[in-house]
Design a protein with these regions (language model features):
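Canonical tetratricopeptide repeat
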Residues: 94, 128, 162-163, 201-202, ...
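Structural motif corresponding to the intra-repeat A-B loop/turn of tetratricopeptide repeats
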Residues: 102, 136, 170, 175, ...
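Extracytoplasmic and endomembrane cell-envelope/extracellular-matrix remodeling and assembly machinery
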Residues: 1-155, 183, 228, 265-269
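Residue-level recognition of tetratricopeptide repeat
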Residues: 97, 131, 165, 169-172, ...
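TPR alpha-solenoid repeat register
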Residues: 91, 125, 159, 198, ...
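Terminal, low-structured helical/coil segments at or just beyond the last alpha-helical repeat
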Residues: 208, 217-219, 223-269
Length: 269
């Protein structure tokens, strides 16, 4: 605390260099002298209190977070904040994201590949690469990047959803890829149970596999999350006709139908 007080007093002392009209009101009513700063510094030294060293890992993570946010929210400021030849992780990340935001495919790809090269075992850099590749239409490269991210972080639901999305929308994907996407998405339900995108993708994958009852069931799940009771009931009623009786999916469809009926009855009261 005392160290912070010394720092505060030194900042206020800078007011001495300013014209009186530009000095802070606090400084004009609380004049700071070199003696007061010296006295406080001496007391701090005699107290035996050691300054707390910053956690370098947290500081590094904070710098990375700031760089990523800067790239997404203020891409035009990146070149003012980081030198273009700065090869630190925050700088490379900021330039990769800024180029992506500015639709500069060549630079975005070059920078994100450099970022992955700096930390090849970081799943989130492979995830970012997958996102950049996908949005520039490079789906095979996106697929490889997301596959690597998922391998490094298999329990991350958001990575699994993004990977499944690429498997589903890629025209090169076959039935085995669609089944892999379904496996990924079903595995992600535990960590992302409120994701409407997850259920929409499941419906799309089952639809591509010509499994209409399951596609309808997951569309009903999506409608349920959106609090659309009539649509939930309609889709679940269509789904249950083709589901094996007493199967887990059949019982879930029954639950969704019951929810829709209860909602309808409540509105009539």
């Amino acid at each position: 605390k005392k160290k912070k007080n010394v720092s505060f007093l030194k900042k206020l002392q800078d007011n001495e260099l300013l014209p009186e009209t530009q000095q802070s009101e606090y400084y004009r009513t609380h004049p700071i002298t070199r003696n007061r700063i010296s006295a406080l510094t001496t007391r701090l030294a005699q107290s035996g209190v050691k300054p707390v060293q910053p956690n370098l890992h947290w500081k590094d993570q904070h710098n990375r977070m700031k760089a990523k946010l800067l790239g997404f929210l203020s891409p035009q400021q990146v070149s003012w904040t980081y030198d273009d030849h700065d090869n630190t992780i925050p700088a490379v990340m900021a330039y990769a994201v800024a180029a992506y935001q500015n639709s500069d495919e060549k630079k975005a790809v070059r920078k994100v590949e450099a970022l992955v090269g700096l930390e090849p075992d970081n799943p989130y850099y492979h995830e970012l690469a997958g996102q950049i590749y996908a949005d520039f239409g490079r789906l095979e490269e996106s697929r490889a990047a997301y596959a690597k991210a998922h391998k490094l972080r298999p329990k991350d639901g958001l990575i699994a959803i993004a990977y499944a999305h690429i498997l589903i929308v890629n025209d090169q994907s076959g039935a085995s890829d669609l089944k892999e996407a379904i496996k990924l998405l079903r595995g992600a339900i535990a960590s992302e149970p409120r994701s409407t995108r997850l259920y929409r993708l499941l419906a799309t994958a089952y639809g591509k596999l010509k499994n209409d009852p399951m596609a309808k069931l997951y569309l009903a799940e999506e409608a349920y999350l959106k609090r659309n009771a009539p649509e939930t009931g309609r889709l679940a009623s269509l789904a249950i006709r083709g589901l094996a009786e007493n199967s887990q999916e059949w019982h879930r469809a029954k639950d969704l139908i019951f929810y829709a009926e209860q909602h309808k009855a409540a509105k009539k009261r």
